[in-house]
Amino acid sequence: MPAANELSATQLVAAVTSGALRVVDIAQAVIARIEARDGEVQAFAHFDKEALLRQAEALDRAPVKGPLHGVPLGIKDVFNTRDMPTAHNSPRYAGSRPGVDAAAVDTLRAAGALLVGKTVTTEFAATLRGGKTRNPHDPARTPGGSSSGSAASVADFQTTIALGTQTGGSTIRPGSFNGVYAMKPTWNSISREGFKMGTISADTVGLYARTAEDLALLADVFDLDALEGPMPVTLAGARVAICRTPVWPKAQPEVHAAMTQAEAALRAAGAVVSDLDLPEIFARFADAQARIHARETRSTFLNEYRTTPDLHEEFKARVEHRDAPAAAELREAYKLVDICRALFDDIAAAYDVILTPSATGEAPLGQDKTGDASFNSMWTLLQVPVVNVPGFHGPAGMPVGLSLVARRYEDRKVIAYAGLAGTLFAAEAGA
């Protein structure tokens, strides 16, 4: 049997329920992995092994609490936690202990999850400036961001599942760079109470796992909307659209190759594949999104601006509204986004899922920046469910993920197809 920290959530729950593993065994395996790898990966902003062992012992003494009993969970350090600090990677909140769990954390704790620690985020999850976390596949490269530590901890077997957030591409892009399943659910389908938001109309709780089956388990825990039809069990006959989006010129050769391989594999598996060119109005979406982001982050960071003398210049600029859109421009931006949301729901109804890039390429070298969110941002503000599906690799041997997208509230369908596509992509890439 693999080490406990290498098992999936589904396997761990079965092992704990049958008595084959104790939660303490799982905790000890996690501790050993973190101690062996933390010097290189640095996924955690807060980790207390003694507290983790006490928590594991308490779970072993208790009856099975729920569907995640004993499953190691990483929590992005923008979520409030009652028994760990929540610092947002900012001097403003260093040592802060809210004393209460964010709603998503509370839900996972009630389901029996083993809370390993707080994972590294970029400051306030609102900047492209890199943090201390390194990509576990190559420490010279970024793990992406802002959910840097969550993605890296899952990829490196330090956690089994993890919480992230997404304003632009903060869950999906790290999923691609680290080679794990990553999900941005339908906007607000998981409560956002108790985490620091940047853009209110976009920010979404994100999920990480190493298998699509584990994403489905998390969907159960968070009671995501049920499938409207039968569960997909094959790609044969599936209606798949290939959408390169208006930012396709940014795609690097490895993304071109992955999309080409994926399309060929889907056709060979019997899927009905067609190209999807979005209407012209979507070419104006990025500009509208930038205007909305500028205005909403001004409100988000106003309190820090007024109470924190050493707030980073990037956040000062946002609050001071130095690049502010005029009121009329802002109203037009919201109007365009509303039109695109309704239009996309109608367009996507013709397909089961839409295949699109997760990132512009492999994880870039260096730690100064966390990468480009261009292929993620539109889907985030459209508020639709997205799953990064791992499987392909670029010329440096680094992971290259692709995303599956569907209409709002079709989260479980996307997860089901992600599982089928993930198996196919891994076989196609020889993983």
List PLM regions with ranges.
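An N-terminal boundary/leader segment
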Residues: 1-50, 267-270, 429-431
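Glycine-rich, small-residue loops and helix-cap segments
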Residues: 19, 30, 70, 110, ...
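Acyltransferase
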Residues: 20-28, 57-60, 253-277, 302-306, ...
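Acidic/His- and Gly-rich active-site-bordering loop/insert found
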Residues: 52-54, 61-130
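Short helix-loop capping/hinge segments that flank enzyme active sites or metal/cofactor-binding pockets
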Residues: 68-88, 237-239, 291-345, 390-401
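Glycine/threonine-rich flexible loop motifs
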Residues: 85-95, 252-253, 363-370
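Short glycine/serine-rich loop segments
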Residues: 100-219, 382-393, 399-401
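A short helix-breaking turn/cap at a secondary-structure junction
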Residues: 184-263, 425-431
